């Protein structure tokens, strides 16, 4: 039977604990029959349906719909819920069959999900049952079309940690030793007037004035000027990011832009060249001249060394993921698996991203040059490359807190268009702006965790939880397209951060084998032979193919559970005999010896 939690990496246990506490406080009664309920979540309707499970066949159940999720319970067994799907995960809802349909279970709804699932429900033809469910699901899965709020804006969850406080740009730049004599913090974009998709605070060369920045902005796509992302703690080589120059077919030049890149180059006295990595294939960069874009030519930028990284655009990546979906859900064809996987080109794209990031990281680590990274607009491939390179170079970003800061900084504050790429609350499933750019980044991170199992503080469940809530609309973290829009909507005041959930339950997301090595640089092997399809994400809904947890990790978790059980028993013993434990001049040998042992790390 298909389950709501197809792998051990699922946030639902945390969610259930949250709801149990709410019930104990008297705020919300236990909804075990009609489904779980978060604070702020309200029931809308329920209907008897037949779920066409692709793995075990038809299941008769009752479908509950709230303003956050759809939830299915079997009417035939009293087992755990069969489905628990946030409405934000839904990409498309279609009616199947018509009034003349006569086949068994041929009349109902077909639901396509962003997490690679397809859900099919058969309904009775009489009584407008399908129309009612279709209308309710459409309104609440795609609330923006009906002037309804996303669930994040009505979510009333409370956590002991405020995830919005995790990232402070001044503190993060200070951690990197900035500002210094070569770099300064500029507030030229404080009102988002220079660039409406950049953060309010930017790090730029000390010798460049704010007026210089304004002139440079006119020659960069979307005004996304070159700014610093990361600086090496020893050799002070920097990773910069920006968008393409507006060269056009006429070969337009900007003396201000050329001088600005020279100033960047001169911040690192160890080299006479500035390395520019253009993420695009060279032919695409040339083609972009026709629409006013382009690249840094040798004539205009003689002190720059330009390389193209051959990473394809959002449309190619969207098609590649569609092919992955076709081969992993609902069934995997074993006989042609390798050729089918190769035909998706998904691992080839992962390889190119990792290879490009290694080139960026190695150039900076060697101190040979500072690096400028861009694609077309500087918010998709650019973010992938800078974050992966920074993960390779800086061990801080491989911690749980550091990774959260990395995502907040390079993806969220620098304007990756999450709303457009994911389509939060939008029913236009065929929108050409949708693309799995952030999913690819997380996949690359997972590949690195497989090759360096002790280098990352977080585990696979951490990455899966991030992706699940990328779509769920339960939290405000990934909503909207840029920092300016989030400030206007007061997201940090009106919504909960996903980091609140994670940082309040760190044990569930911690890698037991983590060994902190802050100065270690890691370069993954990028040959396709060493890359894998992430089974526990892409094929997690198939109960027949799910990977088993690592035996050592499983044993570690068992020991942790055993430790917690002993601590609980010790606390119960202390509560049961308070007088004896307090009055005795010599503590019982058992309790005196057990307590310290409970702090031993297994």
Curated annotation (Swiss-Prot):
Enzyme class, first EC level, given as a word: hydrolase
Region spans: Disordered: 1-40, 578-602
Biased composition (Polar residues): 578-592
Domain GRAM: from-to ranges: 28-97
Cross-referenced SMART domains: GRAM, PTPc_motif
GO cellular component, one term: cytoplasm
Keyword Protein transport: yes
Catalysed conversion reaction: a 1,2-diacyl-sn-glycero-3-phospho-(1D-myo-inositol-3-phosphate) + H2O = a 1,2-diacyl-sn-glycero-3-phospho-(1D-myo-inositol) + phosphate; a 1,2-diacyl-sn-glycero-3-phospho-(1D-myo-inositol-3,5-bisphosphate) + H2O = a 1,2-diacyl-sn-glycero-3-phospho-(1D-myo-inositol-5-phosphate) + phosphate; 1,2-dioctanoyl-sn-glycero-3-phospho-(1-D-myo-inositol-3-phosphate) + H2O = 1,2-dioctanoyl-sn-glycero-3-phospho-(1D-myo-inositol) + phosphate; 1,2-dioctanoyl-sn-glycero-3-phospho-(1D-myo-inositol-3,5-bisphosphate) + H2O = 1,2-dioctanoyl-sn-glycero-3-phospho-(1D-myo-inositol-5-phosphate) + phosphate
Compositionally biased intervals (Basic and acidic residues): 9-31
Domain description: The GRAM domain mediates binding to PI(3,5)P2 and, with lower affinity, to other phosphoinositides.
Family according to the record: Belongs to the protein-tyrosine phosphatase family. Non-receptor class myotubularin subfamily.
Designated name of the protein: Myotubularin
